[in-house]
Amino acid sequence: MTPAQQRQFDAITADLNRLVRYDDESVVHEHWIRQRYDGGYAATYRPARTAAVITAWHEAGHVVAALATGARFTSASIRHSATSAGRVHAITTGGRDAFVIHAAGQIAERLRDWTTLDDDAELAAWLSTWRDDGGDARHFRATLGPGYGEVSAWRHAERILTPRRLQIRHLARALLVYPRYLPYGVTKALYQAVSYQAGNPASESSTTSAPAS
């Protein structure tokens, strides 16, 4: 990391430690709430908060999948625009597991509230309806390797991402508390910071609402 990125990492880590007992919606930076409300993407602040959280988990899923498969990217952000609610910028190929990166946003959203589909028939039915999603669905299907159907590829992606739920959550919360984009070096450091702390109960059980600001 550059010195500037180290300062970003330290500031984000300090904020996450300070807010460790608060739930995800309570840690959303006002910038992301106002950006969604002022831009007309949410009718009130409450749905703006919720939308920011869902987007943060989605983009954090892409980040973790990229890091897990050895792909590179330039930065990640939950800035809402006319074409997307957030973005991981300039992702390079993830090799033969590139499809994992494209599935990761949806998988992370389901890991957030533990709504993954265990039944293969139910998953196949859902996949048949999955379209667009900022290009994720199209890229997922385009990068399936030999020997993979959609369901088997999805299960493979889940096997990679489910053990990394803590990392996804940590990066999602980092995206929520920091009001600007996160460069690759900072996201990688945040990912590595929890890679050896999977047994930390405080990281997995934040349910308190923060005081109104």
Where are the predicted features?
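Soluble catalytic regions of large protease machineries
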Residues: 2-213
